[in-house]
Amino acid sequence: MNFKGTTVIAIRRAGKTVVAADGQVTFGYTVLKSNAVKIRKLVNGKILAGFAGSTSDAITLFEKFEEKVKSREDGIIDIKRAAVDLAKDWRADKILHKLEAMMLVADSDNILLISGTGDVVEPEEDVISIGSGGNYAYSAALAYMENKKLSAADIAFKALKIAARVCIYTNSNIVLEEIG
């Protein structure tokens, strides 16, 4: 899937987890909005999530993911299990299968990418990015990770600023959430 119009990044470092995104919404070649919020806190602020793709589809997926997390009878928050369960449903369900979005979800211990093709990816490094500017932000973040003085929030902000300079579908109106 190749979504135009956003860049979302997730980073873990020094006990902090950050998900950040730009604010641009495009329709074709037109910028419709520059200050959209594409990330949110779920499960009473214990999980961060961000999306690239259709907004209405992403909201549906956020709700489904949160349902999966909360469905455990033992009350344990297990985003890996919830992500796999959501990916299975997303791939198999006739209605969900048509949703066009990708998600990043993160808690204090994990960062995951969930796609509609059934993929659940845990990055090798403590950083992952999606969307049209995702590769630019990811590359910049990997370079910034070498500077041990930078926090997860600093790295996310700087990486998105670089993506905004290169990707025409990404702007520098950055929204950032942090847990940990």
Swiss-Prot record:
The active site is at T6. The keyword Protease applies. PROSITE patterns: PROTEASOME_BETA_2 (PS51476). Keywords: Allosteric enzyme, Cytoplasm, Hydrolase, Metal-binding, Protease, Sodium, Stress response, Threonine protease. It catalyses: ATP-dependent cleavage of peptide bonds with broad specificity. Its main location: cytoplasm. Allosterically activated by HslU binding. SUPFAM superfamilies: N-terminal nucleophile aminohydrolases (Ntn hydrolases). It is found in: Cytoplasm. Its EC number is 3.4.25.2. Na(+) binds at A164, C167, T170. One of its GO terms (cellular component) is HslUV protease complex. GO terms for molecular function: metal ion binding; threonine-type endopeptidase activity. Belongs to the peptidase T1B family. HslV subfamily. Protease subunit of a proteasome-like degradation complex believed to be a general protein degrading machinery. A double ring-shaped homohexamer of HslV is capped on each side by a ring-shaped HslU homohexamer. The assembly of the HslU/HslV complex is dependent on binding of ATP. This is ATP-dependent protease subunit HslV.
